[in-house]
Swiss-Prot record:
InterPro entries registered for this protein in UniProt: UPF0180 (IPR005370)
S-S pairs: none
Protein name according to UniProt: UPF0180 protein Bcer98_1118
Domain of life: Bacteria
Species lineage: Bacteria, Bacillati, Bacillota, Bacilli, Bacillales
Family: Belongs to the UPF0180 family.
Length: 79
């Protein structure tokens, strides 16, 4: 299965993805995202100026406003 990076505050999402058989990595720093097929972030630390370096070649899913099930569905459709 896919390697999914998930922000550490999203424990319910981490558990749900693990139950679906994905390898879940807790995102603590930018380097954690480099080997991930997909990353799930809270969106709270969005870059206000719109300038950012790409740390991952995989999809990035912003969890803000989504349920755990919706996030899992998005992950499944992107990996």
């Amino acid at each position: 299965m896919a390697k999914i990076g998930v922000e550490s505050s999203l424990t319910d999402v981490q558990q749900a993805l693990q139950q679906k058989g994905h390898e879940v990595i807790s995102l603590q720093s930018e380097s954690d995202a480099k080997e991930c097929d997909c990353c799930v972030i809270t969106g709270q630390d969005s870059n206000v100026m719109g300038i950012s370096d790409v740390s991952t070649k995989g999809s990035v899913i912003k969890a803000s406003g989504l349920t755990t099930d919706e996030i899992c569905q998005q992950v499944e459709s992107r990996v």
